[in-house]
């Protein structure tokens, strides 16, 4: 098109098209816009547009047209590179640079695009060495030394364009070259040219740092070069050997550590570089934008690691200089708000990057100064963070900085054995004291005080909006708890004293308020300010105590922290055990009123202070002062007691090398102390559930404490000996108030606890009586209700529905209580209910919440029990699940969900159905039933007459689910994940069933797999790839050609081939895709050869053709001809790694 007309006509056409594209949508039609876009596209594709583009750049006044001309040059240069003379390319580059130099008022986006074209020319030239960056750097160097700020800014733009173009695939221009090409360029660039840019930048910063006064324009130039230095120091260096992580290395990772190659030693290990950045920061620190860049540069220097250091002594020298510079910078300045995060990043990087041996090799005085500085900074940032909270600031810079420093402390003290003994004790004391002070009210603390010491009264509104402190500040509390252990000698007595004091004051306050109320005063006239301050103090003291005394690791038996154990052992000779037990057993007494209270174990005394808090709360409820209490304090108490009980109650001496006598005597197995405290905790639970039933979070924390008391058999054995346990069970079973008012989730957990308790050690009569009182009433009431003749008429009444929902929740709770040794009895009990539940599906078909809850009962039973069930019982469960699915299917047949809310409902029930099917399938993976004596004795195998298999149920379920899965529903991530997990499982476990599916269902399944592979997240794509191998193996087994599955796998061969060879994909998927490709190649060898031939025949570049041909030959050399053999498959996957590394980027273009 463009060749047929002259330059003026081209310009006229382009300017008209630009006018259309720039016009508001209402002014032009879609067709006009598409036509305009087409004009620009064909212009950019035109052959050798260089002369026209030059003419456009020199004559057109339309910015968008100039931008497009620059883009056309950039694309054409790469496209026609081998046809162009070296001189032509050089003159084109010179023209573009001169053009920009001569037009300082160009629009920024036009200038950036022209410079990008220059960068692309340089990049393309760097590969065949026809152009190198040296001449560019010479020109840039001259521009910099011109002293003209505009010209210097342009020089910076040129360097930035080069840096962006070479840095990573994310920022690389889309110029139709292979990823391998981009990678090679980056590696060449980072060895020499990147360093050259860094040196030029250093010269500018050096020059500017010497100047006394900078005007606005000069400051602007300075800022640009500082940002450029930051870009260089944040460069993600490609390692020399790529291996299979080749492509992944292209993807920019957040928080890139500085890992330069050896060639950078001279540049970066020179102390003057680091000194310059410290000097620069001192100069510009009051400008918040520039300060962020200079601190980020220093943070990157603090993260430096890798081959740049010849040995450890070089690291020590470097680190020592860095620490000295940092201390000099911080000492003697008042830190600005904008510096806090940057400084904390430097410290955080330094502590996480350098090994302990390097840190400890620092001169003693320097290391001590650093730890001292870190201590002061942490305390200072903590105070400022507290102030930010009072003022409710949006930008919590000090909180972010404080979190970082506390994280750094955690890193240090967790490895404190590498450091001089006791070197962290004093710093830990200071940081701990500071934290406590910031969280206590005046006069002891500074909580809610503004900078000038005035109290803020907006606390309540702020707190209402926040999530729970123990979640919100869990990382901070973990660090403070750890520091508290390091300095246990100071911190445990401190917490104890403060908590005892607050509880005594709280007790006094509540007594005064009681007298005030008895004088018939209106409760609203009570001034709560003092009370609220006390509650908030107690809240933080209990949280810190909980984190100091115990960890709660996931899935492990929590142990008493070694520092706490050692502290208790160290002081055990000064402890009177009897007085300690008296203190523990007297929560109603003030600790100081007990003679010899100072000769008690401090760890137990801290627990006693919490029990005392709990006792004051309980007494206040008995005195009808509940309205004066804080539910938050109630939550804190049971949270603490649960955390404590998991670790200390019935402490197992076998798990410890040495044990503290006071702890063992007070809480060990078969001790009076343990029995007393179990009784006390149970009493607390019962009291809470009756007083606080309307506070769902507090009630939930309370029943979780109850579960902790019975989940371990040893603890449960003590619990069931308590009379009030039995009365709690009876009360709940009879749905007596106030327990029936608890929220459904709390009722579910309470049921779980009561069932777990039933498996404690009891004689058979007692056990029978227990079940008769806990489970029998539930069954009776349910059957009486649903067997009423008029149930269909009354089923929607509120009271009836509540009863049904409560029963379903209880059934979920019973299922959740399943353990290997109780599954036999629980399964029989639950099975009686499941058939009745299916009847309820019919009754409540128009009530989605109830239907979901019914399905959830099945989900829980399958999830918790299927892995323990033998064959006969599994069959029963499959049959009842199949019936459930049939009823669900009948009720949903042809049902259209029109509104969004309905789709949400459908989303929930579909999710539950798929969860149920996945749980049933899990039997194939996890099956403990063979080793289960409980079940084996009761079952006879009925292999020959199997009525229903898991496959039947699951495939029937998929038949229901597939037609209901719309594209819109797949946008819900949880639904999408569950769906693909399910269909992958099916293909892996029952591949032989797939060819037997009805035609429509088979097609839907194949379409789903293709959609998942090509249009979903990498996680879903991987699941679908994993589904292909078993399907291909199934085809190979049957050796039937032209079946629908055989044809489908042939289609998948092309998809997987393209994914591995032609598309950019996540390296983690290479293995899954490779396994799929191998099995598909075994099945369709001729088609695979055809794909390779077609690909090779399209290669015009002889070099690429040869490399590809060799790579494909090597790929299959180890397995010719390929067969479904594990050894061959492993060899193929190994070859595939090399194949992807060598040609993975060759055909994948950008």
From Swiss-Prot:
Q: Which spans are transmembrane here?
A: none
What GO molecular functions are on record for this protein? nuclear export signal receptor activity
One GO BP annotation of this record:
protein export from nucleus
Q: Where in the cell is it found?
A: Cytoplasm; Nucleus
Q: What InterPro entries would the database entry show?
A: ARM-like, ARM-type_fold, XPO1_C_dom, XPO4/7-like
Entry keywords, A to Z: Cytoplasm, Nucleus, Protein transport, Transport
Keyword Transport on this protein?
yes
Q: Which SUPFAM superfamilies match?
A: ARM repeat
Spell out the GO cellular component terms annotated for this protein, sorted alphabetically and separated by semicolons: cytoplasm; nuclear pore
Keyword Cytoplasm on entry: yes
- The secretion signal range is none
The coiled-coil regions, if any, are none
Q: What is its main location?
A: cytoplasm
Its annotated function is as follows:
Mediates the nuclear export of proteins (cargos) with broad substrate specificity.
Query: Which family, according to the similarity comment?
Result: Belongs to the exportin family.
Q: What is this protein called?
A: Exportin-4
Please tell me the species this chain comes from: Danio rerio
Gene giving rise to this polypeptide: xpo4
């Amino acid at each position: 098109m463009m060749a047929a007309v002259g330059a003026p006509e081209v310009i006229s056409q382009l300017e008209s098209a630009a006018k259309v594209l720039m016009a508001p949508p209402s002014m032009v039609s879609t067709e006009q816009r598409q036509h305009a876009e087409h004009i620009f596209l064909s212009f950019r594709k035109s052959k050798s547009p260089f002369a026209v583009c030059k003419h456009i750049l020199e004559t057109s006044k339309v910015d968008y047209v100039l931008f497009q001309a620059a883009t056309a040059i950039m694309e054409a240069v790469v496209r026609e590179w081998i046809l162009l003379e070296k001189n032509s390319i050089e003159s084109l580059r010179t023209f573009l640079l001169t053009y920009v130099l001569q037009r300082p008022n160009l629009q920024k986006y036009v200038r950036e695009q022209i410079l990008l074209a220059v960068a692309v020319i340089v990049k393309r030239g760097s590969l065949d060495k026809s152009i190198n960056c040296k001449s560019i750097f010479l020109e840039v160097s001259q521009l910099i030394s011109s002293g003209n700020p505009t010209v210097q800014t342009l020089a910076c733009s040129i360097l930035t364009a080069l840096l962006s173009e070479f840095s990573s695939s994310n920022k690389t221009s889309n110029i139709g070259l292979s990823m391998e090409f981009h990678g090679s360029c980056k590696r060449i660039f980072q060895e020499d040219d990147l360093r050259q840019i860094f040196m030029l930048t250093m010269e500018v910063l050096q020059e500017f740092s010497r100047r006394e006064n900078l005007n606005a324009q000069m400051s602007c130039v300075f800022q640009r070069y500082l940002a450029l230095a930051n870009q260089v120091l944040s460069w993600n260096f490609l390692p020399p050997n790529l291996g299979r992580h080749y492509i992944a290395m292209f993807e920019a990772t957040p928080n890139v550590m500085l890992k330069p190659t050896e060639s950078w030693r001279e540049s970066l290990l020179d102390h003057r570089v680091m000194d310059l950045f410290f000097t620069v920061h001192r100069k510009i620190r009051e400008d918040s934008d520039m300060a962020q860049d200079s601190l980020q540069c220093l943070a990157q220097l603090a993260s430096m690691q890798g081959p740049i250091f010849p040995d450890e002594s070089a690291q020590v020298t470097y680190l020592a200089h860095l620490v000295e510079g940092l201390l000099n910078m911080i000492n003697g300045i008042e830190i600005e708000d904008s510096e806090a995060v940057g400084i904390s990043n430097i410290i955080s990087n330094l502590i996480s990057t350098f090994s302990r041996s390097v840190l400890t090799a620092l001169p003693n005085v320097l290391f001590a100064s650093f730890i001292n500085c870190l201590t002061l900074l942490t305390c200072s940032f903590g105070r400022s963070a507290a102030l930010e909270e009072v003022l409710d600031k949006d930008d919590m810079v000090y909180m972010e900085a404080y979190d970082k420093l506390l994280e750094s402390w955690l890193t240090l003290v967790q490895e404190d054995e590498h450091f001089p003994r006791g070197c962290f004790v004093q710093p830990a004391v200071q940081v701990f004291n500071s934290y406590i002070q910031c969280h206590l009210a005046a006069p002891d603390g500074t909580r809610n005080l503004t900078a000038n010491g005035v109290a803020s009264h907006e606390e309540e509104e702020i707190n209402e909006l926040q999530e729970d402190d123990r979640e919100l500040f869990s990382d901070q509390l973990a660090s403070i708890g750890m520091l508290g252990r390091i300095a246990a000698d100071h911190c445990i007595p401190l917490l104890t004293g403060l908590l005892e004091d607050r509880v005594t004051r709280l007790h006094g306050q509540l007594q005064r308020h009681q007298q005030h109320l008895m004088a018939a005063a209106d409760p609203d006239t009570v001034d709560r300010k003092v009370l609220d301050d006390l509650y908030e103090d107690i809240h933080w003291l209990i949280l810190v105590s909980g984190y100091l005394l115990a960890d709660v690791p996931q899935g492990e038996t929590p142990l008493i922290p070694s520092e706490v154990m050692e502290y208790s052992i160290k002081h055990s000779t000064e402890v009177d055990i009897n007085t300690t037990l008296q203190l523990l057993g007297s929560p109603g007494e003030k600790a100081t009123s007990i003679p010899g209270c100072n000769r008690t174990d401090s760890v137990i005394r801290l627990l006693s202070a919490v029990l005392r808090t709990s006792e004051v709360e309980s007494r206040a409820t008995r005195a009808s002062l509940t309205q004066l209490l804080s539910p938050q304090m109630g939550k804190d108490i049971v949270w603490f007691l649960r955390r404590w009980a998991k670790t200390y109650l019935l402490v197992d001496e076998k798990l410890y090398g040495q044990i503290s006598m006071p702890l063992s005597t007070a809480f060990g197995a078969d001790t009076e102390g343990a029995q007393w405290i179990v009784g006390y905790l149970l009493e607390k639970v019962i009291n809470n559930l009756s007083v606080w039933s309307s506070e769902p979070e507090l009630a939930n924390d309370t029943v979780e404490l109850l579960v902790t008391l019975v989940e371990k058999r040893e603890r449960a054995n003590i619990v069931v000996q308590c009379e009030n346990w039995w009365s709690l069970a009876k009360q709940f079973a009879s749905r007596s108030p106030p327990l029936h008012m608890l929220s459904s989730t709390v009722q579910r957990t309470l049921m779980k606890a009561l069932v777990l308790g039933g498996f404690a050690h009891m004689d058979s009569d007692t056990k029978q009586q227990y079940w008769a009182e806990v489970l029998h009433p539930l069954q009776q009431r349910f059957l009486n209700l649903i067997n009423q003749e008029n149930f269909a008429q009354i089923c929607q009444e509120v009271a009836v529905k509540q009863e049904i929902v409560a029963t379903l929740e209880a059934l979920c709770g019973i299922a959740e209580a399943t353990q290997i040794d109780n599954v036999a009895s629980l399964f029989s009990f639950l099975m009686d209910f499941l058939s009745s539940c299916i009847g309820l599906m019919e009754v409540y078909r128009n009530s989605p919440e109830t239907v979901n809850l019914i399905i959830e009962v099945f989900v829980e039973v399958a999830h918790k029990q299927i892995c323990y069930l033998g064959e006969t019982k599994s069959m029963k469960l499959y049959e009842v699940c199949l019936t459930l699915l049939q009823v669900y299917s009948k009720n949903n047949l042809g049902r259209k969900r029109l509104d969004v809310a309905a789709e949400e409902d459908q989303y929930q029930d579909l999710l539950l159905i798929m969860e149920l099917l996945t749980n049933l399938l899990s039997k194939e993976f996890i099956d403990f039933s063979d080793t289960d004596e409980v079940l084996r004795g009761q079952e006879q195998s009925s292999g020959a007459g199997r009525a229903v298999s898991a496959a039947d149920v699951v495939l029937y379920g998929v038949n229901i689910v597939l037609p209901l899965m719309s594209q819109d529903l797949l946008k819900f991530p949880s639904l999408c994940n569950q769906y693909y997990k399910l269909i992958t499982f099916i293909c892996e476990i029952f591949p032989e069933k797939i060819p037997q599916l009805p035609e429509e269902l088979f097609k839907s399944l194949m379409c789903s797999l293709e959609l998942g592979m090509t249009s979903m997240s990498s996680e879903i794509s991987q699941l679908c790839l994993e589904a292909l191998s078993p399907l291909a193996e199934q085809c190979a087994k049957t050796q039937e050609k032209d079946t629908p599955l055989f044809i489908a796998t042939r289609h998948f061969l092309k998809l997987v081939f393209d994914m591995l060879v032609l598309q950019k994909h996540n390296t983690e998927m290479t293995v899954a895709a490779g396994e799929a490709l191998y099995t598909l190649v075994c099945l369709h060898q001729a088609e695979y050869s055809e794909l390779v031939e077609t690909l090779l025949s399209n290669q015009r570049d002889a070099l690429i053709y040869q490399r590809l041909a060799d790579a494909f030959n090597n790929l299959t050399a180890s397995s010719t001809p390929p067969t479904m053999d594990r050894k061959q498959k492993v060899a193929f996957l190994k070859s595939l790694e090399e194949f992807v590394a060598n040609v993975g980027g060759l055909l994948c273009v950008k």
